[in-house]
Structure formats: structure tokens, C-alpha cells
Design a protein with these regions (language model features):
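Local cysteine-cluster metal-coordination motifs and their immediate loop/turn environment
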Residues: 21-34
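C-terminal scaffold of the Radical SAM
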Residues: 3-6, 11-15, 34-63, 68-344
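Short, Lys/Arg-rich nucleic-acid/phosphate-binding segment
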Residues: 252, 366-369
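Short amphipathic alpha-helical interaction segments
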Residues: 343-355
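Basic, amphipathic "hinge/linker" alpha-helix immediately C-terminal to the N-terminal HTH DNA-binding motif
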Residues: 369-376
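A short, conserved structural fragment
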Residues: 358-367
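Short, amphipathic alpha-helical interaction segments positioned at domain boundaries
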Residues: 376-389
Length: 389
């Protein structure tokens, strides 16, 4: 029998994730819930379903949501920039009619450089979007072709130019390293070109081969572990020298430009989720923590079959779920947040923390835990120690 949490939960900040599943074509490395566009995308119909889905969630989970405003919205995909600014404006306006926005809400929209024009960027800003995340991935036309991207390097730089002169609050560039046959110099050249464009935020992550992707069926030749380490180490030095602060495993930002939406994920915050295959997490004052997901395929979703699955997060699973998120961040973890957001006493993790200290994976003060440089190298081993026996 599962022992209930000993303490009521403090409700964390609330975000909203919106999934738009269509893209121009499926990239060979992509394992996200995305569907290649065939004919005209039913934008208005899909937006209506998103709003119906949200309305149902606000009713179903009212005990959790209460009067909490949204601190961030992230519109991901797929390729959300395939949708018109008019439909994004209508969607955001209707969401605000249903749930209040916090005064400085961050609203991010993912964009593909191949679908970006100056007018479209301005339209998104007028719609209420204040942050754009662009999937650049590389500035090498050869590498972009191997990755199945629909844009080239010139289009990528042009799209970044639109973002820089727009009234956006911030923008992010997604860049990958460890690409097929990529050398150290090629990886660093990509990074230098990104830095020259001066984005406030850079997500710099390693390509991994995911199951059920084209790359999984036909694996390309990737850099080995030693080459990957050299790329990361020298790339990290480049970013730091350019004034970027690493605040998460793959995230770098200029001061005060961290992604608030992702910070809320990693700090074990709450997030509503609407759209095909979207995943949400909600806390309830009585101690319950719920995870849920939505129907993946657009056909089922647009039949009104929104909710796919719900599961309670057991007390045994909460330490792993909490630290799996928190230890991705480089900031110290406040002990009181573990108690407040999981409902568990500190004694629930005493043994594991003593082991982690002995292994020099973490340091500890009266108020915080902090992953060490050594601990970052063994992060998976550290996290596995929190799994229920």
C-alpha cells in the first residue's frame, strides 16, 4: 500500500504547453510526435479543438489550478510556425479569456527557419508571442541536408536577422553537435557562427539516435566519445567566453535570459498540456501529484478524444521524479522545495543523500544540495539511486 505524503503540497508556478503536430517533412533523427504535412493543415479546426481541450482540463483539474495564473506558454511541435499569426493570435486571446496570464508571462513559439519571413515574425509578436525558438541545428548546408532540414544556412541567418530586429523579448537558437561525420572544427565553427548572431539564449545539445527514427534504422557514423568530449569541452569554453552562462545540461543564456518555461519544468513546476501527445503535470493541495497525456494522432484528437492517460505519481516515485528534473539545473536545490513540492520529509532521501555525499556526487549545506562537477559526469548513476527499490 502506498503511504500518503505527510505534508500538504505547496502549489508551484503553472505553465501551459501546446503541441502543434504538423511539419513540412519528418527529420530522420526526430522522435517527437510530428506528422508530415499532407495538403492543407486544418488550422482553425485544430485551434477550436485545443480550446475545447483546455476548457475540459480547467474544469477537470480545477482543484489543482484554482486561481493560479499562467507564468509561461510554450507552443511546440512539429512546426508551429506553419500556423498563421491570425490563428495564433486567436488561440492566445481565447486562452487568456479562460485562465489569467501573469504580468510578465513568457510566450514562446517554435519556428523553423524555412517557414520564417519578416512579416510572419512581426505577426507573431502582434499575436502576443514574445519569444521565438528557432531550430537552426547547423550552419553547414551539407549537415543540414543529412539532418533532413528544409532550410539552408543562408535562410537560417536571415531568420535570425528577422528575430533580432523584431520587438521580441528574447529568442533562442537550437544547435546540435555530434552530427554525422562532424569534426571538432566543424562543430566549433557552427558554434562560432551562432555566437556571432548574438542570440540571448542558445540550446546546444548532442545528437542522439532515438528508437523508431530513420537514423535508428540506418545509423550514420557519429563522433566517438573522446571526440564528443573535446567538442563539449571546447564549445563550453567558447560559450562562456562569449558571456553565456550554462544553467542546464544543454542550455546557455545571457544573464536574465533563461527560458522561464523550461525552468518551470526542471524546478518540478506544474504545467497544463493541450494538443496531440502533449504531457502535463499537476499538483493538488491534498498531496496528490498527477501526470497525464493527450491522444497522439491528429485524427483521434480531432474526433474530440483528447485525454489519453492519467497516472498518480506515487510517494515512492517522487524523489526520482523531483531530482531527475532538479539535478539537470546547475543551481543549488533548496531542501524546503523538496518537502513542499513532493509532500515528503527530508528523511525520505537521507540514505541516498549520504551515499551521494560519500561518492562526492553532491555537496550539502543546511538549506541546499548541489551536484558537483564530478557528479555531473555520473548523473545517471546519481539519479538511479533515487529509484524505488
Amino acid at each position: 500500500m502506498i503511504t500518503p505524503p505527510l505534508n500538504p503540497l505547496r502549489l508551484p508556478p503553472l505553465s501551459l504547453y501546446i503541441h502543434i503536430p504538423w511539419c513540412v517533412q519528418k527529420c530522420p533523427y526526430c522522435d517527437f510526435n510530428s506528422h508530415a504535412q499532407k495538403g492543407t493543415i486544418p488550422e482553425q479546426e485544430y485551434v477550436r479543438h485545443l480550446l475545447t481541450d483546455l476548457t475540459a482540463d480547467l474544469s477537470r483539474y480545477q482543484e489543482s489550478i484554482q486561481q493560479r495564473p499562467l507564468h509561461s506558454i510554450f507552443i511546440g511541435g512539429g512546426t508551429p510556425s506553419l500556423f498563421s499569426a491570425e490563428n495564433i493570435a486567436f488561440l492566445l486571446h481565447q486562452i487568456e479569456q479562460r485562465i489569467p496570464f501573469a504580468p510578465h508571462i513568457e510566450i514562446t513559439l517554435e519556428a523553423n527557419p524555412g517557414t520564417a519571413e519578416a512579416e510572419r515574425f512581426l505577426g507573431y509578436v502582434q499575436a502576443g508571442v514574445n519569444r521565438i525558438s528557432m531550430g537552426i541545428q547547423s550552419f553547414s548546408d551539407e549537415k543540414l541536408q543529412k539532418l533532413g532540414r528544409i532550410h539552408n544556412a543562408a535562410e537560417a541567418k536571415s531568420a535570425v536577422g528577422f528575430a533580432r530586429v523584431s520587438p521580441l523579448r528574447s529568442f533562442n537558437l537550437d544547435l546540435m553537435h555530434g552530427l554525422p561525420n562532424q569534426t571538432l572544427n566543424e562543430a566549433l565553427d557552427d558554434l562560432r557562427q551562432a555566437i556571432e548572431l548574438a542570440p540571448p539564449h542558445l540550446s546546444w545539445y548532442q545528437l542522439t539516435i532515438e528508437p523508431n527514427t530513420m537514423f535508428a534504422y540506418r545509423p550514420p557514423k557519429l563522433p566517438d566519445d573522446d571526440e564528443l568530449w573535446d567538442i563539449f569541452e571546447q564549445g563550453h569554453q567558447l560559450l562562456t567566453a562569449a558571456g553565456y552562462q550554462q544553467y542546464e545540461t544543454s542550455a546557455y543564456a545571457k544573464p536574465s535570459f533563461q527560458c522561464q518555461h523550461n525552468l518551470n519544468y526542471w524546478r518540478f513546476g506544474d504545467y497544463l498540456a493541450i494538443g496531440c501527445g502533449a504531457h502535463g503535470k499537476l499538483s493538488f493541495p491534498n498531496g496528490k501529484i498527477l501526470r497525464y497525456s493527450k491522444t497522439k494522432h491528429p485524427k483521434g484528437y480531432m474526433r474530440g478524444e483528447y485525454l489519453y492517460e492519467e497516472r498518480d505519481v506515487s510517494t515512492e516515485d517522487r524523489p526520482f521524479e523531483f531530482f531527475m528534473n532538479r539535478f539537470r539545473l546547475l543551481e543549488a536545490v533548496p531542501k524546503n522545495e523538496f518537502e513542499q513540492f513532493t509532500g515528503l520529509p527530508l528523511s525520505a532521501v537521507d540514505k541516498t543523500m549520504a551515499w551521494a555525499l560519500d561518492q562526492k556526487f553532491i555537496t550539502e549545506t543546511d538549506r541546499t544540495w548541489q551536484v558537483t562537477e564530478h557528479g555531473k559526469l555520473f548523473l545517471n548513476e546519481l539519479l538511479e539511486a533515487f529509484l524505488p527499490e
